[in-house]
């Protein structure tokens, strides 16, 4: 007899941050969201490939994020609004 298992996938929490400009650089956005403490820390985690932008690994700290874009770091998702 085969038993069926029900699996629940826990959704990652999404934190929304409003910007007042056309875009924001990825490193500045991580600081704005308090995902990192300093710009230096942001630089290292981005260069090490620990950050995803819109679901894809991004190693460019100067990446421009616009409203609707998401950044994922340490199992948390941050959305630009």
Question: What annotation goes with each model-predicted range?
Answer:
Residues 46-47, 62:
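Residue-level recognition of conserved structural "scaffold" positions that shape functional pockets
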Residues 1-33, 57-81:
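Ferredoxin-like alpha/beta domains used as RNA- or RNAP-binding modules
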Residues 32-45:
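Short beta-strand/loop turn elements enriched in aromatics
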Residues 22, 44, 51:
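Residues that recognize and position ribonucleotide moieties
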């Amino acid at each position: 007899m085969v038993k069926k298992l029900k699996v629940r996938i826990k959704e990652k929490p999404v934190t929304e941050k409003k910007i007042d400009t056309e875009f924001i650089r990825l490193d500045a956005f991580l600081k704005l969201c308090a995902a990192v403490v300093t710009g230096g820390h942001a630089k290292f985690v981005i260069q090490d490939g620990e950050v995803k932008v819109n679901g894809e690994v991004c190693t460019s700290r100067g990446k421009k994020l616009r409203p609707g874009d998401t950044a994922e770091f340490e199992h948390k998702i941050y959305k630009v609004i």
